[in-house]
């Protein structure tokens, strides 16, 4: 049972981490490159051996786990309604996506064509990001409702930021797929927050220099 929640928590942290980076780009014009790279790398894990393998290891979603802890911990007073709205929208889009096998196949095909470039380039390289952004536009962006990102217009109008946001939304969808594969549902978010918080604490303790507040 604990292993199930372990996997669900990792997947949820993966979604949160990608969306948190989206917020940082929208609000500040940038996000930590290592965190962005870790999220984008998950897109290329098409046949992972485990949930942890999707992110390389637990450290791959360390930021997501810390932010998730803040959202689930009522004592932190750091609940972010905007982040939760993005999370709900991503999960809704993933539900629609699973009913569109042609789009799923298109995504898989495009990712397979991009993947060889990651042998020489970082997942956060502008070239990789541009191609992932195109994949998002050609597939997920055709579904409704489209996710509306809020932030500073000066940041959101910059082409490189637009591409980074789209690539990260694709990464969020990838983690949402994992969440569903692990049996996660929106009801779990509503009624199993305490279980998710417990598992978040457990995972954070395994990460050097990370801790649960």
Swiss-Prot record:
It comes from the Bacteria. The keyword Nucleotide-binding does not apply. Pfam families: DUF489 (PF04356). It is found in: Cytoplasm; Cell inner membrane. InterPro entries: HflD (IPR007451), HflD-like_sf (IPR035932). GO terms for cellular component: cytoplasm; plasma membrane. PANTHER family: HIGH FREQUENCY LYSOGENIZATION PROTEIN HFLD. This is High frequency lysogenization protein HflD homolog. It comes from Nitrosococcus oceani (strain ATCC 19707 / BCRC 17464 / JCM 30415 / NCIMB 11848 / C-107). The gene is hflD.
């Amino acid at each position: 049972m604990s292993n199930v929640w372990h996997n669900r928590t990792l997947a949820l942290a993966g979604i949160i981490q990608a969306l948190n980076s989206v917020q940082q780009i929208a609000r500040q014009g940038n996000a930590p490159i290592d965190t962005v790279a870790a999220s984008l790398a998950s897109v290329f894990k098409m046949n992972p051996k485990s949930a942890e393998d999707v992110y390389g290891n637990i450290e791959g979603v360390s930021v997501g786990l810390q932010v998730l802890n803040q959202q689930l911990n009522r004592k932190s007073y750091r609940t972010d309604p905007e982040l939760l709205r993005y999370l709900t929208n991503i999960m809704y889009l993933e539900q629609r996506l699973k009913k569109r096998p042609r789009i799923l196949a298109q995504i898989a095909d495009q990712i397979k064509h991009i993947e060889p470039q990651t042998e020489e380039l970082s997942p956060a390289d502008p070239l990789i990001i541009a191609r992932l952004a195109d994949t998002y536009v050609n597939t997920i962006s055709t579904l409704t409702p489209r996710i509306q990102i809020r932030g500073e217009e000066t940041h959101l109008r910059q082409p490189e930021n637009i591409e980074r946001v789209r690539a990260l939304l694709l990464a969020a969808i990838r983690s949402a797929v994992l969440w569903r594969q692990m049996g996660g549902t929106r009801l779990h978010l509503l009624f199993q927050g305490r279980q998710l918080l417990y598992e978040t604490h457990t995972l954070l303790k395994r990460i050097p220099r990370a801790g649960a507040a």
